[in-house]
Amino acid sequence: LPLKTERGNRIFPVSDKASDIVDALCRFSKGAKTINAEATALLFDGKRVIGVKTADGEFFAENILVATGGVSYPLTGSTGDGYKFARSAGHTVEEPKASLIPVEIEEGFCKKAMGLSLKNVTLSVEDSAKSKTVFREMGELLFTHFGLSGPLVLSGSAHMRPFEMDRYKLHIDLKPALDLQKLEKRLERDFEKNINRDFQNSLSELLPRKLIPVVVSLSGISGDKKVNQITAQERKKLAELLKNLTVTVKKFRPVEEAIVTSGGVNVKEVDPKTMESKLCKGLFFAGEVLDVDAYTGGFNLQIAFSTAHAAAEGFGS
């Protein structure tokens, strides 16, 4: 499968189609002996797992791999059953919660810019309870009908507590390549070129079309005000807005829309070389059922692939 590397060492298929990953996995698995049956419980003999109970009967095996995913996208089958299986073997399960998830925003202007994707902007996540920035990165984000999404927002969401959302503000620097002083100079030059135009018609070289009415509204400058009437103070405030477009987080989107689940089987109870349980012989874990997660960009898939490979090697050890 042809792959490409993007900003931040994120790996994607060249086609940008997730279905190509699925197709590659399906091709690879052809010929394997598979049974399509709903697993309902693990079977034990003392401190050893000996099989799986399913809706179609019991199946016995020397080794059992739990690779059931988390609770994100339950339509794919990841309904959290793996946590139940792990607990039945005596494992500790760290509380599962949504991670890498779009956020709903209080301000209504996001809907006006719906569908707009911004590249090379900087997103900062401010935790007002701690008076500190808990995430800051440059990349891409997307305006949606409910708020914000895209790689930057997904990664930033991993640093927010889902039940205390009112403590977070998102700060978007629309022009991170320019400091405030240079941006003011840029605005001054643009205004000189458009000196007889209305303010709302003077920003086409600086901002995407969908974002212009949003910025005009937030700037406090009347859209039909002539550029030659804009004061130095108004120009400075506009520059400050472009460097710090601030939105208030309302809540996460439903867990069903999360890219990954944070939390899961405590990794201290799993052998990192073989992925075998330290509590139950013959029981192995791989992928998102474990308390391991990472940023978007193929890293979580790599965790799944690598832990599964280690488990497969562990079967024979």
Predicted segment positions?
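Short hydrophobic core segments
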Residues: A39, V52, F59-T76, A86-R87, ...
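A conserved short coil-to-beta-strand element within the FAD-binding core of flavoproteins
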Residues: I35-R48
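An anion/pyrophosphate-binding glycine-rich loop and adjacent beta-alpha core
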Residues: T92-E95, E104-Q229
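A glycine-rich dinucleotide-binding beta-alpha-beta segment and adjacent secondary-structure elements
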Residues: I35-A37, P213-D293
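Glycine-rich loop(s) and the adjacent beta-strand/alpha-helix scaffold that form part
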Residues: N63-F109
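A conserved FAD-binding loop/helix module that cradles the flavin
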Residues: G69-A89, V292-S317
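Conserved N-terminal/central alpha/beta ligand/cofactor-binding core
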Residues: L1-A32, E38, F143
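Flavin (FAD/FMN) cofactor-binding core of flavoprotein oxidoreductases
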Residues: V14-S19, S99-E107, F252-E269
